[in-house]
Amino acid sequence: MQNLAEIDELIKLISRLPGLGPKSAKRIVLKLINNREELIKPMAKTLAEVYKNIFRCKICGSLKSNSNGCNNCENNKNKYNKICVVENIADQWSIETSSVYQGYFHILGGTISSSNNQNKEDLLINSLLERVQNEDIEEVILATSATVEGQTTAFYIENSLKNTNVKISKLAQGLPVGGEIENLDDGTLISAFKNRQNFKS
Protein backbone atom coordinates (compact mmCIF):
# COMPACT_ATOMS: atom_id res chain seq x y z
CA MET A 1 0.00 0.00 0.00
CA GLN A 2 1.27 3.46 -0.88
CA ASN A 3 2.32 5.51 2.12
CA LEU A 4 0.50 8.79 1.55
CA ALA A 5 0.46 10.79 4.76
CA GLU A 6 -2.93 12.38 4.12
CA ILE A 7 -4.56 9.04 3.36
CA ASP A 8 -2.96 7.35 6.38
CA GLU A 9 -4.20 10.12 8.64
CA LEU A 10 -7.73 9.93 7.21
CA ILE A 11 -7.80 6.15 7.73
CA LYS A 12 -6.68 6.60 11.35
CA LEU A 13 -9.38 9.20 11.98
CA ILE A 14 -12.17 7.15 10.43
CA SER A 15 -10.98 4.06 12.37
CA ARG A 16 -11.79 5.94 15.58
CA LEU A 17 -15.48 6.05 14.71
CA PRO A 18 -17.72 3.50 16.51
CA GLY A 19 -17.92 0.13 14.80
CA LEU A 20 -15.20 0.87 12.26
CA GLY A 21 -11.80 -0.78 12.15
CA PRO A 22 -8.83 -0.19 9.83
CA LYS A 23 -10.23 -2.39 7.02
CA SER A 24 -13.61 -0.66 7.02
CA ALA A 25 -11.88 2.72 7.21
CA LYS A 26 -9.76 1.88 4.16
CA ARG A 27 -12.86 0.95 2.15
CA ILE A 28 -14.54 4.21 3.14
CA VAL A 29 -11.46 6.24 2.21
CA LEU A 30 -11.26 4.56 -1.20
CA LYS A 31 -14.95 5.29 -1.78
CA LEU A 32 -14.33 8.94 -0.90
CA ILE A 33 -11.28 9.21 -3.14
CA ASN A 34 -13.16 7.68 -6.06
CA ASN A 35 -16.01 10.16 -5.58
CA ARG A 36 -14.16 13.37 -4.89
CA GLU A 37 -16.71 15.83 -6.23
CA GLU A 38 -19.83 13.95 -5.09
CA LEU A 39 -18.60 13.07 -1.57
CA ILE A 40 -15.38 14.72 -0.40
CA LYS A 41 -16.18 18.28 -1.42
CA PRO A 42 -19.71 18.50 0.08
CA MET A 43 -18.66 16.44 3.11
CA ALA A 44 -15.75 18.76 3.87
CA LYS A 45 -18.08 21.77 3.59
CA THR A 46 -20.73 20.20 5.82
CA LEU A 47 -18.21 19.07 8.45
CA ALA A 48 -16.79 22.59 8.60
CA GLU A 49 -20.29 24.01 9.10
CA VAL A 50 -21.09 21.46 11.81
CA TYR A 51 -17.82 22.23 13.60
CA LYS A 52 -18.56 25.95 13.46
CA ASN A 53 -22.27 26.00 14.26
CA ILE A 54 -23.38 22.89 16.17
CA PHE A 55 -22.77 22.45 19.91
CA ARG A 56 -24.23 20.65 22.91
CA CYS A 57 -26.74 22.76 24.82
CA LYS A 58 -25.40 23.59 28.28
CA ILE A 59 -28.91 23.39 29.74
CA CYS A 60 -30.32 20.12 28.40
CA GLY A 61 -27.34 18.48 26.67
CA SER A 62 -29.06 18.17 23.29
CA LEU A 63 -27.61 19.56 20.08
CA LYS A 64 -28.13 23.23 19.37
CA SER A 65 -27.42 25.54 16.48
CA ASN A 66 -25.71 28.91 16.76
CA SER A 67 -28.36 30.36 14.47
CA ASN A 68 -31.51 28.62 15.75
CA GLY A 69 -30.71 27.75 19.37
CA CYS A 70 -31.84 24.54 21.05
CA ASN A 71 -35.04 23.02 19.70
CA ASN A 72 -35.33 20.75 22.73
CA CYS A 73 -35.42 23.25 25.59
CA GLU A 74 -35.22 26.80 24.19
CA ASN A 75 -37.32 26.98 21.04
CA ASN A 76 -39.69 24.06 21.53
CA LYS A 77 -43.13 25.36 20.54
CA ASN A 78 -44.85 22.68 22.61
CA LYS A 79 -45.07 23.11 26.37
CA TYR A 80 -44.51 19.73 27.97
CA ASN A 81 -44.64 18.69 31.62
CA LYS A 82 -42.31 15.68 31.26
CA ILE A 83 -38.55 15.27 30.94
CA CYS A 84 -37.01 12.04 29.67
CA VAL A 85 -33.46 11.60 31.00
CA VAL A 86 -31.07 9.69 28.71
CA GLU A 87 -27.35 9.04 28.68
CA ASN A 88 -26.46 10.35 25.24
CA ILE A 89 -27.82 11.95 22.09
CA ALA A 90 -28.03 8.58 20.30
CA ASP A 91 -30.54 7.50 22.97
CA GLN A 92 -32.56 10.67 22.38
CA TRP A 93 -32.66 10.00 18.64
CA SER A 94 -33.74 6.37 19.16
CA ILE A 95 -36.65 7.38 21.39
CA GLU A 96 -37.68 10.18 19.04
CA THR A 97 -37.67 7.77 16.10
CA SER A 98 -39.94 5.34 17.95
CA SER A 99 -42.54 8.13 18.48
CA VAL A 100 -43.43 6.57 21.85
CA TYR A 101 -42.67 9.73 23.84
CA GLN A 102 -43.74 13.35 23.55
CA GLY A 103 -41.88 15.66 25.91
CA TYR A 104 -38.56 17.30 26.72
CA PHE A 105 -35.27 15.40 26.82
CA HIS A 106 -32.31 15.81 29.13
CA ILE A 107 -29.04 14.30 27.93
CA LEU A 108 -26.60 13.57 30.74
CA GLY A 109 -23.53 13.03 28.58
CA GLY A 110 -22.70 9.61 30.02
CA THR A 111 -23.11 7.67 33.26
CA ILE A 112 -21.52 7.63 36.68
CA SER A 113 -18.72 5.12 36.18
CA SER A 114 -15.58 4.23 38.09
CA SER A 115 -14.18 2.28 35.14
CA ASN A 116 -13.73 5.39 33.00
CA ASN A 117 -13.34 7.85 35.88
CA GLN A 118 -16.61 9.63 35.05
CA ASN A 119 -18.09 11.27 38.14
CA LYS A 120 -21.48 12.85 38.74
CA GLU A 121 -19.85 16.25 38.41
CA ASP A 122 -18.98 15.41 34.79
CA LEU A 123 -22.66 14.91 33.89
CA LEU A 124 -25.49 17.40 33.37
CA ILE A 125 -27.23 16.45 36.61
CA ASN A 126 -27.27 19.84 38.33
CA SER A 127 -28.88 21.44 35.29
CA LEU A 128 -31.56 18.71 35.39
CA LEU A 129 -32.37 19.61 38.99
CA GLU A 130 -32.57 23.28 37.99
CA ARG A 131 -34.95 22.47 35.13
CA VAL A 132 -37.23 20.54 37.47
CA GLN A 133 -37.25 23.43 39.93
CA ASN A 134 -37.70 26.23 37.40
CA GLU A 135 -40.00 24.66 34.82
CA ASP A 136 -43.52 23.28 35.19
CA ILE A 137 -42.35 19.66 35.24
CA GLU A 138 -44.63 16.95 36.63
CA GLU A 139 -42.72 13.79 35.68
CA VAL A 140 -39.09 12.79 35.18
CA ILE A 141 -38.63 9.55 33.23
CA LEU A 142 -35.29 7.85 33.83
CA ALA A 143 -34.38 6.14 30.55
CA THR A 144 -30.85 5.04 31.37
CA SER A 145 -29.45 1.75 30.10
CA ALA A 146 -29.87 -1.55 31.94
CA THR A 147 -26.18 -1.59 32.84
CA VAL A 148 -24.60 -1.25 36.27
CA GLU A 149 -23.50 2.28 35.37
CA GLY A 150 -26.91 3.20 33.98
CA GLN A 151 -28.75 1.94 37.04
CA THR A 152 -26.28 3.62 39.40
CA THR A 153 -26.87 6.90 37.61
CA ALA A 154 -30.65 6.47 37.74
CA PHE A 155 -30.52 5.75 41.47
CA TYR A 156 -28.41 8.86 42.10
CA ILE A 157 -30.83 11.08 40.15
CA GLU A 158 -33.82 9.52 41.92
CA ASN A 159 -32.20 10.26 45.28
CA SER A 160 -31.41 13.84 44.20
CA LEU A 161 -35.08 14.44 43.32
CA LYS A 162 -36.63 12.77 46.36
CA ASN A 163 -37.46 16.08 48.07
CA THR A 164 -39.31 17.48 45.07
CA ASN A 165 -42.96 17.02 44.16
CA VAL A 166 -42.17 15.64 40.75
CA LYS A 167 -43.21 12.11 39.77
CA ILE A 168 -40.21 9.89 39.05
CA SER A 169 -40.55 6.85 36.81
CA LYS A 170 -38.20 4.37 35.22
CA LEU A 171 -38.47 2.32 32.05
CA ALA A 172 -39.96 -1.15 32.59
CA GLN A 173 -37.63 -3.95 33.58
CA GLY A 174 -38.27 -5.74 30.30
CA LEU A 175 -35.08 -4.15 29.02
CA PRO A 176 -32.35 -6.76 28.49
CA VAL A 177 -29.68 -6.70 31.20
CA GLY A 178 -26.72 -4.75 29.93
CA GLY A 179 -28.80 -3.39 27.07
CA GLU A 180 -28.24 0.15 25.84
CA ILE A 181 -31.18 2.32 24.81
CA GLU A 182 -29.81 3.19 21.36
CA ASN A 183 -29.64 -0.50 20.41
CA LEU A 184 -33.25 -1.38 21.29
CA ASP A 185 -35.89 -1.90 18.64
CA ASP A 186 -39.02 0.26 18.55
CA GLY A 187 -41.24 -2.49 19.97
CA THR A 188 -39.08 -2.92 23.07
CA LEU A 189 -38.88 0.84 23.59
CA ILE A 190 -42.64 1.29 23.26
CA SER A 191 -43.29 -1.52 25.77
CA ALA A 192 -40.70 -0.13 28.20
CA PHE A 193 -42.29 3.34 28.12
CA LYS A 194 -45.88 2.16 28.40
CA ASN A 195 -45.06 -0.11 31.34
CA ARG A 196 -42.66 2.22 33.12
CA GLN A 197 -42.54 1.92 36.90
CA ASN A 198 -42.97 4.73 39.40
CA PHE A 199 -40.24 5.40 41.94
CA LYS A 200 -42.34 8.02 43.66
CA SER A 201 -45.29 10.27 42.91
Task: Cite the ranges covered by each PLM segment.
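Cys/His-rich Zn2+-binding cysteine-cluster or related metal-binding knuckle/ribbon modules and their
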Residues: 2-7, 16, 26-92
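Conserved phosphate/pyrophosphate-binding and hydrolysis machinery centered on Walker-type P-loop NTPases
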Residues: 18, 37, 50, 63, ...
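Extended interfacial segments that mediate partner engagement and assembly in macromolecular machines
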Residues: 25, 75-144
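Generic secondary-structure boundary/loop-capping signal
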Residues: 30, 70, 83, 92, ...
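Long C-terminal interaction/binding lobes of large macromolecular proteins
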Residues: 36, 131-201
